[in-house]
């Protein structure tokens, strides 16, 4: 029998004698009718599962057409089939399609699958003998470490990376700026400050020639002299503005004590008096109108 129930259970290195287990068992029936010889299933080293489930006619149909079998042998074959069903409890199922039949059985002759390439797909057979699931292959991708990210999460990660890189760049730039040594302030001596103050009392602004002369006399650079005069002018303006404000406040206090008023105060008083007179006139008009209405009512 070429297509038997044990076609997938046999070992790939088995001899040609294992191809026809039923033929051997049928030959053994000539001598012994009460004992059946079955193939040793425990010694089978095949990892292939049962893929085809032929029915009673497909399993033993070929034995009916053999010319050397007799009716007595056919009776024992039916008894063998019944005993086989009672021992193994093989369910009667419709044979699956040929495409799924070949896809479920693993070939031992071929080597292990090459896992060194791109992410492989590991297929696990979930079909059992008691179910009618013809496909039964749950395919799981082999790339377990990688997880699919949503576009929002990817954008968040890229934005975070960009912000981190920008922060690191800003921090490096600030560190570079802070690492640059500041220019040391010029420490003027008392004699140099005295000469510069005397010159500033006469001239707030220096000509180029005079600046050169002062720099040579005081052993300074022209830039140092120029910067000192710039700073001194700013200080003088601040002091002058403060003095002018203080002088104006003192003058107002003196005028208040004397009883005299400033022109600004006089203008304010005049505007207030004009507003008061206008209000009084409106009040008088309203009072007259109310009195006339009362007389008319009487």
From Swiss-Prot:
Name where it mostly resides.
nucleus
Give the top-rank taxon of the lineage listed in the UniProt record for this protein. Answer: Eukaryota
Q: Where does the protein end up?
A: Nucleus; Nucleus speckle
Disordered, as annotated region = 57-122, 143-186, 277-298
Record field: compositional bias (Basic residues): 63-78
Q: Where is the composition biased (Low complexity)?
A: 109-122
Alphabetical GO biological process terms: positive regulation of transcription by RNA polymerase II; regulation of transcription by RNA polymerase II; somite development
* Residue spans binding DNA: 181-240
Query: Which is a Gene Ontology cellular component entry for this protein?
Result: nucleus
Which UniProt keywords are present, listed alphabetically?
Activator, Developmental protein, DNA-binding, Homeobox, Nucleus, Transcription, Transcription regulation
- Database matches in CDD domains: homeodomain
Which residue intervals are annotated with compositional bias (Polar residues) in the record?
A: 83-108, 166-176
Q: Basic and acidic residues compositional bias: what residue ranges?
A: 153-165, 177-186, 284-298
Q: Which GO terms describe its molecular function?
A: DNA-binding transcription factor activity; DNA-binding transcription factor activity, RNA polymerase II-specific; RNA polymerase II cis-regulatory region sequence-specific DNA binding; sequence-specific DNA binding
Written domain comment of the UniProt record: The polyhistidine repeat may act as a targeting signal to nuclear speckles.
What's this protein's name?
Homeobox protein MOX-2
Tell me what organism the protein belongs to. Xenopus laevis (African clawed frog)
Q: Which gene encodes it?
A: meox2
């Amino acid at each position: 029998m070429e297509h038997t129930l044990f076609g997938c259970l046999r070992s790939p290195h088995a001899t040609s004698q294992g191809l026809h287990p039923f033929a051997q068992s049928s030959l053994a029936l000539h001598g012994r009718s009460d004992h059946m010889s079955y193939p040793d299933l425990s010694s089978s080293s095949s990892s292939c599962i049962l893929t085809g489930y032929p029915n009673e006619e497909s399993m033993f149909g070929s034995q009916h057409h053999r010319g050397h079998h007799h009716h007595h042998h056919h009776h024992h074959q039916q008894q063998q089939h019944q005993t086989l069903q009672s021992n193994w409890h093989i369910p009667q199922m419709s044979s699956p399609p040929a495409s799924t039949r070949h896809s479920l059985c693993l070939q031992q002759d071929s080597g292990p699958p090459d896992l060194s390439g791109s992410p492989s797909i590991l297929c696990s057979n979930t079909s059992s003998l008691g179910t009618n699931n013809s496909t039964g292959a749950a395919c799981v991708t082999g790339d377990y470490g990688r997880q699919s990210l949503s576009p929002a999460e990817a954008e968040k990660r890229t934005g975070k990376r960009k912000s981190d890189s920008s922060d690191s760049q800003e921090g490096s730039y600030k560190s570079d700026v802070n690492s640059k040594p500041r220019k040391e302030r010029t420490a003027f001596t008392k004699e140099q400050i005295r000469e510069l103050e005397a010159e500033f009392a006469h001239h707030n602004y220096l000509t180029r020639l005079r600046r050169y002369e002062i720099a040579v006399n005081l052993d300074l650079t022209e830039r140092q002299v120029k910067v000192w005069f710039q700073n001194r002018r700013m200080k003088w303006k601040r002091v002058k503005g403060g003095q002018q404000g203080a002088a104006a406040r003192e003058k107002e206090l003196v005028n208040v004590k004397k009883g005299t008023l400033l022109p600004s105060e006089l203008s304010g008083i005049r505007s207030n008096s004009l507003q008061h007179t206008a209000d009084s006139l409106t009040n008088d008009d309203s009072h007259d109108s109310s009195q006339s209405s009362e007389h008319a009512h009487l």
